[in-house]
Amino acid sequence: MEQAAGEPTRTCLTEDIPKAKRCTVIGGCGFLGQHMVEQLLARGYAVNVFDIRQGFDNPRVQFFLGDLCSQQDLYPALKGVSTVFHCASPPPFNNNKELFYRVNYIGTKNVIETCKEAGVQKLILTSSASVIFEGVDIKNGTEDLPYATKPIDYYTETKILQERAVLGAHDPEKNFLTTAIRPHGIFGPRDPQLVPILIEAAKKGKMKFMIGNGKNLVDFTFVENVVHGHILAAEHLSQDTALGGKAFHITNDEPIPFWTFLSRILTGLNYEAPKYHIPYWLAYYLALLVSLLVMVISPVIQLQPTFTPMRVALAGTFHYYSCEKAKKLMGYRPLVTMDDAVDKTVRSFHHLRKVM
């Protein structure tokens, strides 16, 4: 395939780095992607970024902008690299089914084919532990649990399709190796979702109640640990390892009560923690009633309820996952403890701190 017009010329520094240390981060301008770029550079990699728009500047990074579903746009960013990290996705709380399907599934199929066309050897996918979650308790869940037959949302539905496509493309005979990393509850500095949304809800007085008894354990995973898992997967993935065509949970390995975690963020930024309890069953059936009402009036009025049964399940059930497989096969250990991760995150959002 010929070089596309406008393709950046590689610098001498990049040319001095062996192909095994050249990589592309698809979605590299996003929350996880930026952290991944930073750690890869720190470890001596030459890094390309492919994204729909450029979100930051770094003279050591080559940026390629375009449509994930276009091989013509994507190919220049993958040419000459050994490894591709694919972490592009619409935000999980988006409710646009067509967008999720186009980016997470159609776009990923294009990533696979373009990787093969460009001679990429390794494709590391950012998947999600939610691909096995159906709204009921999961305690220390392992990777051999089946995919959810009733995914919690459009995001998860298309992440299942995406992960299946990537793992199914693993072909050691043709020197194309794939694996998928399944984080859960990613948080950290520059997070555009969890902390800002939480603080906005607190400002509106919506964080006074907790669903259930507050004891349900959940995995929240610090972004640096998620990146570490991706890089370990890439560095351990070879034709003679058991990583190929497999998925791996990556967590902080410190399950924490869901409401305790949120409370630590809130109080760290000078907001009150939830004080009152709503029984789980009551919250679930209220959400179910709201969903039914929305369905009934949908021919007349289109509404997007935020209080849904599955979101109640996310807040009120146990869902934490074993990362023993990643420990055994790639030597994974979290780099940052939960206490340090929460502290770093709170300090990074000082601009959201409530003035007392």
From Swiss-Prot:
Active-site residues, Swiss-Prot/TrEMBL: Y155 (proton acceptor)
EC number: 1.1.1.170
Residue list for modification N-acetylmethionine: M1
Record's keyword terms, sorted: Acetylation, Cholesterol biosynthesis, Cholesterol metabolism, Endoplasmic reticulum, Lipid biosynthesis, Lipid droplet, Lipid metabolism, Membrane, NAD, Oxidoreductase, Steroid biosynthesis, Steroid metabolism, Sterol biosynthesis, Sterol metabolism, Transmembrane, Transmembrane helix
Transmembrane stretches, start-end: 281-301
Membrane topology label: Single-pass membrane protein
Keyword Lipid metabolism: yes
Catalytic activity annotation: a 3beta-hydroxysteroid-4alpha-carboxylate + NADP(+) = a 3-oxosteroid + CO2 + NADPH; a 3beta-hydroxysteroid-4alpha-carboxylate + NAD(+) = a 3-oxosteroid + CO2 + NADH; 4alpha-carboxyzymosterol + NADP(+) = zymosterone + CO2 + NADPH; 4alpha-carboxy-4beta-methyl-5alpha-cholest-8-en-3beta-ol + NADP(+) = 4alpha-methyl-5alpha-cholest-8-en-3-one + CO2 + NADPH
A cellular component term, taken from the record's GO annotations: endoplasmic reticulum
GO biological process, any: cholesterol biosynthetic process
Pfam family, one: 3Beta_HSD
Pathway, per record: Steroid biosynthesis; zymosterol biosynthesis; zymosterol from lanosterol: step 4/6
Location in or out of the cell: Endoplasmic reticulum membrane; Lipid droplet
Residue positions binding NAD(+): K159
Broad class of where this protein is predominantly found: endoplasmic reticulum
Motif, Prevents secretion from ER: chain positions: 353-356
MF terms in GO: 3-beta-hydroxysteroid dehydrogenase (NAD+)/C4-decarboxylase activity; oxidoreductase activity, acting on the CH-OH group of donors, NAD or NADP as acceptor
Top-rank taxon, per record: Eukaryota
Protein purpose: Catalyzes the NAD(P)(+)-dependent oxidative decarboxylation of the C4 methyl groups of 4-alpha-carboxysterols in post-squalene cholesterol biosynthesis. Also plays a role in the regulation of the endocytic trafficking of EGFR.
Family: Belongs to the 3-beta-HSD family.
Complexes and interactors: Homodimer.
Official protein name in the record: Sterol-4-alpha-carboxylate 3-dehydrogenase, decarboxylating
Organism: Bos taurus (Bovine)
Protein's gene: NSDHL
